């Protein structure tokens, strides 16, 4: 074969290969177009097949939440339809309390990235329940956890995470800069209330779906503060209580009615002989009931009940089973403040059922240790100390702390009544445990059930001190 023939042969082979390659590319383009057309068309069909099954492997991010799972099928596309939470149902009948969540955040925080927190509380929408908490702008077992026994600082913030999870930078959502706070969902969006600033000029910042909608300035210039638990939403309006004034004497107490983050009405309570702080509130048949802390002179708990027009009634739980801490031994109660061991106090809650009341309280009379639920069938109106049911949830030897109420609406549970629930803060570190340089807490929660339950202890369980404390 002479050189010219070789050139012609090689050229022919190259042209043949090029032609085949071009045909393959055209076929590939046609195949992609047909596949895209089929996928686009299938998205227009409705029915049970439009649920997307996504397989997550190893570590990934889902809706800004870090997930560490393997080969797990998750059904995506949960219905997120907005609806107004009516709040018109009565409380569900219950016989006891079932454990609902436990986050073990202090135990996990000895080795993982977990926030230093206090004042956790829980609130539920019609889709989910979330744990809200006040961070100290620091992580456990880190140098910035030093001195976090302080209540009010510019580093504190209200954040939230899915219920039952240890609060960390990887699963938590920023809500508001705050050292006192509340939050609730009206069925359409989250209302958050965050109070921050100096003691003599603090400001409450109201946000609706993350956007600032209203400001409340301290009117007494004496540590404006709010509930440290969920506010209450009824028929599209949300309600909260704030306190401004002395913690050891008469102060000023205001109820606010809020719609989509905007204040539509407010009143000041006429309660010169009562003291209302850190109220735990819940809806019941369209009204709002709040059970609060008397830090001035009552070892029984004050209450205020009001309707959607803010017409209100006030009083004290009459039972001789006293709910505050410190408190005297159970005995003769009063429908007015019980002055014995009445100074100071701790955030708490109760649920009213007619003349009866479920009382949540520490097991210790003098320190924040242990926790129990007591059913007094006449305790709302009678002053004796007789009760029918006592359920232990934290042993006397283990630390507790604040506690508060939250409810699950029928729109979430599918029940025809309002499910009562509560949470308990399990404080660890200073000032009681002086081997640490920090103060933080984990939490547990329970919900009411109409069945037999169990006495047990669900303590924090962390072994102290940590490495940073050595």
Curated annotation (Swiss-Prot):
HAMAP family: INFV_NRAM
Processing and modification events after translation: N-glycosylated.
Other remarks on this protein: The influenza A genome consist of 8 RNA segments. Genetic variation of hemagglutinin and/or neuraminidase genes results in the emergence of new influenza strains. The mechanism of variation can be the result of point mutations or the result of genetic reassortment between segments of two different strains.
Subcellular location: Virion membrane; Host apical cell membrane
Segments of this protein annotated with the region Involved in apical transport and lipid raft association: 11-33
Residues annotated as the enzyme's active site: 151, 402
EC number: 3.2.1.18
Binding site for substrate: 118, 152, 277-278, 293, 368
TM region positions: 7-27
One Pfam assignment: Neur
Coiled coil feature spans: none
Entry protein name: Neuraminidase
Coarse class of the protein's main subcellular location: virion
Cofactor(s), by name: Ca(2+)
Intravirion side: 1-6
Regulation of catalytic or functional activity: Inhibited by the neuraminidase inhibitors zanamivir (Relenza) and oseltamivir (Tamiflu). These drugs interfere with the release of progeny virus from infected cells and are effective against all influenza strains. Resistance to neuraminidase inhibitors is quite rare.
Protein family per UniProt: Belongs to the glycosyl hydrolase 34 family.
Superkingdom of origin organism: Viruses
Ranges where the record places region Hypervariable stalk region: 36-90
UniProt binding sites for Ca(2+): 294, 298, 324
Catalytic activity field: Hydrolysis of alpha-(2->3)-, alpha-(2->6)-, alpha-(2->8)- glycosidic linkages of terminal sialic acid residues in oligosaccharides, glycoproteins, glycolipids, colominic acid and synthetic substrates
GO molecular function: exo-alpha-sialidase activity; metal ion binding
Protein keywords: Calcium, Disulfide bond, Glycoprotein, Glycosidase, Host cell membrane, Host membrane, Hydrolase, Membrane, Metal-binding, Signal-anchor, Transmembrane, Transmembrane helix, Virion
Signal sequence extent: none
């Amino acid at each position: 074969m002479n050189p010219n023939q070789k050139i012609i042969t090689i050229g022919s082979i190259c042209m043949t290969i090029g032609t085949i390659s071009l045909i393959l590319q055209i076929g590939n383009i046609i195949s992609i177009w047909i596949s895209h057309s089929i996928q686009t068309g299938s998205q227009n069909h409705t029915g049970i097949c439009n649920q997307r099954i996504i397989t997550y492997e190893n570590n990934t991010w889902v809706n800004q939440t870090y997930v560490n799972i393997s080969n797990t099928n998750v059904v995506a596309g949960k219905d997120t339809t907005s609806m107004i939470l009516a709040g018109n149902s009565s409380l569900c009948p219950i016989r006891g309390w079932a454990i609902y969540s436990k986050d073990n955040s202090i135990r996990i925080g000895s080795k993982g990235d977990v926030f230093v927190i206090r004042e956790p509380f829980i609130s539920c929408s019609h889709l989910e329940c979330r744990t809200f908490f006040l961070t100290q702008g620091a992580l456990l077992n880190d140098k910035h956890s030093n001195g976090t026994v302080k209540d009010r600082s510019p580093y504190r913030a209200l954040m939230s995470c899915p219920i039952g999870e240890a609060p960390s930078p990887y699963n938590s959502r920023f809500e508001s800069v705050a050292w006192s706070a509340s939050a609730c969902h009206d069925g359409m969006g989250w209302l958050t209330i965050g109070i921050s600033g100096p003691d003599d000029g603090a400001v409450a910042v109201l946000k609706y779906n993350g956007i600032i909608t209203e400001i409340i300035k301290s009117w007494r210039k004496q540590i404006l503060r709010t509930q440290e638990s969920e506010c209450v939403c009824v028929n599209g309006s949300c309600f909260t209580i704030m306190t401004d004034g002395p913690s050891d004497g008469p102060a000023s107490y205001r109820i606010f009615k809020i719609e989509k983050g905007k204040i539509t009405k407010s009143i000041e309570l006429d309660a010169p002989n009562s003291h209302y702080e850190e109220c735990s509130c819940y809806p019941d048949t369209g009204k709002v009931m709040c059970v609060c802390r008397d830090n001035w002179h009552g070892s029984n708990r004050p209450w205020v009940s009001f309707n959607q027009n803010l017409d209100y009634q006030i009083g004290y739980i009459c039972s001789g089973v006293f709910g505050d801490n410190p408190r005297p031994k159970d005995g003769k109660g009063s429908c007015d403040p019980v002055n014995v061991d009445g100074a100071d106090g701790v955030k708490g809650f109760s649920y009213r059922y007619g003349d009866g009341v479920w009382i949540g309280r520490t097991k210790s009379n003098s320190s924040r240790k242990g926790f129990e639920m007591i059913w007094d069938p006449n305790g709302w109106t009678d002053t004796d100390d007789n009760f029918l049911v006592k359920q232990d949830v934290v042993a006397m030897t283990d630390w507790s702390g604040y506690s508060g109420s939250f409810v699950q609406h029928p729109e979430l549970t599918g029940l025809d009544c309002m499910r009562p629930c509560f949470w308990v803060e399990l404080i660890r570190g200073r000032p009681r445990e002086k081997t640490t340089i920090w103060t933080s807490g984990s939490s547990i929660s329970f919900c009411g059930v109409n069945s037999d339950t169990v006495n047990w202890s669900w303590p924090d369980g962390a072994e102290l001190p940590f490495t940073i404390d050595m």
